């Protein structure tokens, strides 16, 4: 049998829309658009809303479908959607089916890490919102807990030769 390397293609496939042309410049707008979808779920869903420069949504991607009280995420899966969408910025939204909006240690660490990676890649993190039932939510930015990165990365790297 000859050695061969299979070629695969990764493409975004459109799903039925969640309608919004309104800029997601505050959590109330994001919840108005996303809560009906997320509040019906019996397990955690971790989503990214990819945004244009004026914060108008480009699309939404479900990054992870978890269990009753956790969803495993990988930064690569978050940024894959943002890069393929040519996003200027992004908003992270996930639900807590229990209705308890208190962020877990993992939620806090994920927010800090995604902000750092977003700065490095030039795709800023606008907010991370945890939604419960009945439109209740927790916004990291509104609560003043949105981490400020200690290190600022340039989004434009210059390589020079010493020769």
Labelled PLM ranges:
Residues 12-16, 24-27, 31, 37-40, ...:
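Glycine-aromatic-enriched surface loops/turns that form tight recognition elements
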Residues 41-43, 122-123:
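Short solvent-exposed loop/turn micro-motifs enriched in small/polar/acidic residues
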Residues 36, 42-71:
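Mobile, glycine- and charge-enriched loop segments
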